[in-house]
Structure formats: structure tokens, C-alpha cells
């Protein structure tokens, strides 16, 4: 049984990353992108990166991360970028699938302490009704995005690859809805500059989330997002469609773009 760890030492993280890379066929590029199931032992690399970035930014230590995200570890799907030259993780995104414990963003809205309009909670049924969500199994929760500061200006070249494997996974799992809690400035850039169809989740205002101020819970209709991406980047759209032209779809652990 996999132990879900948020407090590895740097040498432990680096050794696990090197082992992970030894199991993959890599191209000639410096950065490689992968999808990793939350139950995979290698997902601890992404958990470690989450903790490092969140602790540096907001003081969220391993105990806090385990408390907040531990209940969702087995229903998580990580998208991870690895620096194959230095053999260290360069970025990690966590999507949470629906499970008996629910989707974290929606569960938190139904909590009288964590809700954006606390002490008033927003019931799960109200969120579903507000956005026309019939089945939470077709919804992803964009739980975390962690990029170490030294890589934040170096990942532009991998952005398209990362978005591609995420889109492939979403299409494979027939995901129709997306929820998340994002920094309000990120929401403004995504919505006003990039034109992404993000709207406040259940009409909620910005709020403080996990000690980080100025956050916004958001919703997006996934087919609209994918359609927009396809129109704005025709080559990526064609590559996604080509990937799904084959009868056999790859499993998440086979998704890798170089």
C-alpha cells in the first residue's frame, strides 16, 4: 500500500525523481510532462513539491497539507513537469476526482468555517443546481498548482505540452465541469486577458483560503475550455483530435509530452 508523504527530505525527493525518470523514455528536451495517479508511489514527488511551494508562499507545512489534501490523495490525478537535466520536479498540478469524500472546493463551500461567505455555507446541491452539474463524477477540482520560483520563467515552452496531456485526460474521462480556488489576480488574467470562460463558483466573492488572501472559487464548462483552446491553437487542437482518432486510448500513466 502506498504511503502518501508530504515531508520528504530533498535527497529523498531527488532520489525518487531520478528513479522515476529511469522508468521513462525521454526525448531530447530539458522538460518532460507526465500524468501520475495519486495512488502511484511516484506521486509523492508532486506532493513534496506542493508542500515546498505552499510552505514558502503561505506557511502551509506538511501537517497542514496532509490535513487539507490527505483525504483526497487516492482520488487525485497529478500532472507533473520534470527538469530532466537537473532531475528535479519543476511543476505539479493536482486534479481531484469525485469520490465518497467529495471534491475539495465544493466540500469547503459547504463548510461554515471555510466557505467564502462564512459563517454561511453553500450546500453541494446548490452548487450543482447553480451550474447545471448533473453528475459530480464528470467534474474535476483543480486543487493545487505548484511551480518553484526558479522555474516560473522557464516553463513557457512546456505550457502547451502540459495543457495537452491535461486535455487528453479530461476528454478520456469525459470531464464536463471544472471547479477550483485560484488567486484573484490569476482569475483576472485568465478571464480578461486570455479570455477563458471562468465564472465565480455559485456567485461567491473573493475570500481568504488556507491563510492566503484574495482567492476566488471558480467554475468552467470543460468542453467550452477545450473548444476555445482548439480555436486559439489549431496545432494543439489537431494533435488532441489525432490522439483520439485511435481506437485504444492511453491510460493516464502513459500520457507524456516532450
Map each language-model feature to its residues.
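C-terminal/domain-terminus segments
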Residues: 25-41, 45, 51, 65, ...
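Conserved donor-binding loop and adjoining core beta-sheet/short helix segment
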Residues: 63-71, 75-114, 123-127, 142-144
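Extreme N-terminal leader/anchor segments
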Residues: 1-4, 11-13
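Accessory, usually C-terminal, subdomains that scaffold auxiliary metal cofactors
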Residues: 187-189, 193-257
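Ordered hydrophobic segments in well-structured contexts
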Residues: 32-35, 78-80, 92, 177-179, ...
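Short amphipathic alpha-helix that is part of the acyltransferase structural core
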Residues: 12, 17-67, 74, 78-90, ...
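Acyl-donor binding region in acyl/amide transferases
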Residues: 106-216
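Non-catalytic surface loops within mature trypsin-like serine protease
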Residues: 97-99, 149, 184, 222-224
